[in-house]
């Protein structure tokens, strides 16, 4: 079964073709990703310091068809070779979701194909299954992105239990806001992580929110405020030496990243102990953070559990994860999982409410 995946939830337009089984008879004998195209809107939104929803929607309209053509060309397929269409139904920006939904539904209807709406987070948490060492069910998923920070127990395809989540800012959002305080470009996640590598540990005693709360929830707004207070104190000194300013920013970035990593690692380890799971999946945009990966690997070696990651190129939003998750959903429901004819989207959508019965 060849599934077309379309991702337009925020500021990346992603299109991909995934083949569930190796077949012959004129169709690809290769199982896996057949072709993909991805366009990021980062450059367009940088001047605004964040995503502008209207601009995002318009750009998705411009990009989605050329990316489909690109994916078909890569895979040497025609539209008539596609067996199903999967698209991001939510959560995300309403206008952006509507572009992908309308495109996918119209294409599916024109080709008389089934279509399936995919939960964006399900795409992320299943993407490590595409890695070299796939996790075994059940596993714990740490979903960390600009909009979400959650711990999930994953018992199988379509069977998810929320164990904990952020009570305010997501970790990725805290990265972006802190980067802005330090004068770094949008998006700040990668920039602040790179800056932190130049910093010294232990210079600032930043809080590690809810580290000892006893539950699996998160909170990062207080950490962001603590960084702001340190910036204000430094500015009051009116230091004009550029090297001192640069070192201050690097040291503060290091302390900030260390604080977030400590909380994420501690809560993940606690979730594994509470559930008895031996496999941890790290997914979402922050999943590309090398400091977090290193800390999890070190903890896994010491405490006898395994950590699984998606390929680095699949940490950001992409069409591959939507095609893959849609294919797994359809196989789990014997190809019977289709959406209604309306261009229905779910900007706010609880993953557990989408569990298979």
From Swiss-Prot:
Gene3D superfamilies: 3.30.420.40. Required for the formation of a threonylcarbamoyl group on adenosine at position 37 (t(6)A37) in tRNAs that read codons beginning with adenine. Is involved in the transfer of the threonylcarbamoyl moiety of threonylcarbamoyl-AMP (TC-AMP) to the N6 group of A37, together with TsaE and TsaB. TsaD likely plays a direct catalytic role in this reaction. Fe cation binds at residues 120, 124, 317. Binds 1 Fe(2+) ion per subunit. Substrate binds at residues 143-147, 176, 189, 289. The gene is tsaD. GO terms for cellular component: cytoplasm. Keywords: Acyltransferase, Cytoplasm, Iron, Metal-binding, Transferase, tRNA processing. It comes from the Bacteria. HAMAP family: TsaD. Its main location: cytoplasm. It is found in: Cytoplasm. It catalyses: L-threonylcarbamoyladenylate + adenosine(37) in tRNA = N(6)-L-threonylcarbamoyladenosine(37) in tRNA + AMP + H(+). This is tRNA N6-adenosine threonylcarbamoyltransferase. Its EC number is 2.3.1.234. Disulfide bonds: none annotated. Its cofactor is Fe(2+).
